[in-house]
Amino acid sequence: MKLWTWKRENLPSLSHAFRTAFAATISILLGRLIGLPEAYWAAIATVVVMQSPLGTTVPLAIERIVASALGASIGAMESIYFGANLFVFALAMLLLGLISFVLRLEKVGYSYACITLAIIVMIPRAETPWIAAAHRFAEVSLGILTALAVVAVWREEQRLFENTTAN
């Protein structure tokens, strides 16, 4: 009995690990350079985007940026008018699902919107909700754009064991 299955193209490689580490580090440095208060969100977004298959990286990146904007906006509005009310939080997640359906965002976009919403609403902050939302959107967008730049410039090499199978 197998505990898991895998596809050859989804296996990590040494070059992928280097690219991901490089991209995440660059995104944190850029975030700090431009004064983003929690630049680690840029690194998290970079790591997530770096795991996407090459053919879907750009469309998913655009979707993630749109979804982050939605989650940040609805999160800021919820925080201003209702605080961290769990019932309203659940309604906001439902609303994001409906908006995602209308905009034809895939589940990955919907999950990004919900994660951003949760970060804005559930983490107590000193700054106003709109400032927190703007920071999260900027940090996540920076991470996504950094990943896209690294993927475009640093192509991943072929794996050493091309004929490996999951049998």
Please report, for each region that a protein language model flagged, where it lies by residue:
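Alpha-helical transmembrane segments and their membrane-interface boundaries
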Residues: 1-167
